[in-house]
Amino acid sequence: MITSAHIDDIRTQVRAWRAKGETVAFVPTMGNLHQGHITLVKEAASKCDHVVASIFVNPMQFGQNEDLDAYPRTLAADSEALTAAGAELLFTPTPAVMYPKGLEQQTYVEVPGISNVLCGASRPGHFRGVATIVCKLFNIVQPDVALFGNKDYQQLLVIKTMVEDLSLPIEIIGVDTIREDSGLAMSSRNGYLTAAEKAAAPALKQAIDAMAAGIKQGESFEQVTEQAKASLIAAGFTPDYLEIRHAHTLEQAQNQHQALVILTAAYIGKARLIDNLRFDS
C-alpha cells in the first residue's frame, strides 16, 4: 500500500488509475480502526478496481471539551489492517495540509436543517466540520464510490445530502453496522469503557430494539421512548437524546410515517455512544 500525506501524490496515483479506465472507491476514516472500518474497505474492494483510504483526525468536527487530543492515533496498526483488507492508497494528511490558512480562515460546507438536530444540537458545528472535510477529501481523491457506516446514520444523511446538493458525481453507499457479540455497535470510543461499562453498554441496542418492537405492536412513540429512557438510566447511561425520526428527512416522526429511524446518543463513564435502528412501522 502506498502511503502519503501529500495531496499531489494522491491525485497523481488516482490519475494513473483513471488513465487505464479503472474505478476508485474511497473510505475516509479518523484512524484507530476496528472491524467496522475493515468491513467498509472490503466492501469497497468489491465495488471498484482500487480502494483509497484516508486517516485524518479532523479538528474542525471536534467541539470544545471534546476528545481531540485524547483520540487514539494508531497509524502502524491501521496501515497493516488497511493493507490486509485491500486498500492500495492511504492518505494521511496533517491539519496544516488540509487547513493551511487555519480553521478560522477556512471555507466551509454546511448542510442546513439535518445538521442542526440530534448530534448536531448536542455538538454545534460538528456536521459543518464533517461536511467540509469530506467535501475536501472527495475533491482530492475524486472517487466513483465512497462508503460510510450506517452506525453514523445522521452523518450518512448529511453526506448524501451534500453530494446531491453540490452535484458531486459520487455514489454514497451506507454499510450495515458491525456489532460485537453482545450487540454493542463497534466504535473507536468503546476503548474508553471500563469492563463494567462495557458489560452494561449493550443496553443501548436493547433499548432501541424494544422501542421498535413496541411501535410495531401499536404502542405510542411517547410510551416506548419513556420506557427506553428508564431502561438506559437503570443500566447506568445518561441519555443525551433518544428520538424517533423520519428515516429520510430526520423530521420528527408522525404516526402516518412508514419509514422510521430511532436514534440515540448516551453517556456511560467517559464515553458518548451512539446507535440507531432503521425500520418500517
Swiss-Prot record:
One of its GO terms (cellular component) is cytosol. SUPFAM superfamilies: Nucleotidylyl transferase. Keywords: ATP-binding, Cytoplasm, Ligase, Nucleotide-binding, Pantothenate biosynthesis. It catalyses: (R)-pantoate + beta-alanine + ATP = (R)-pantothenate + AMP + diphosphate + H(+). Catalyzes the condensation of pantoate with beta-alanine in an ATP-dependent reaction via a pantoyl-adenylate intermediate. Belongs to the pantothenate synthetase family. This is Pantothenate synthetase. It comes from Shewanella baltica (strain OS155 / ATCC BAA-1091). The lineage of its organism: Bacteria, Pseudomonadati, Pseudomonadota, Gammaproteobacteria, Alteromonadales.
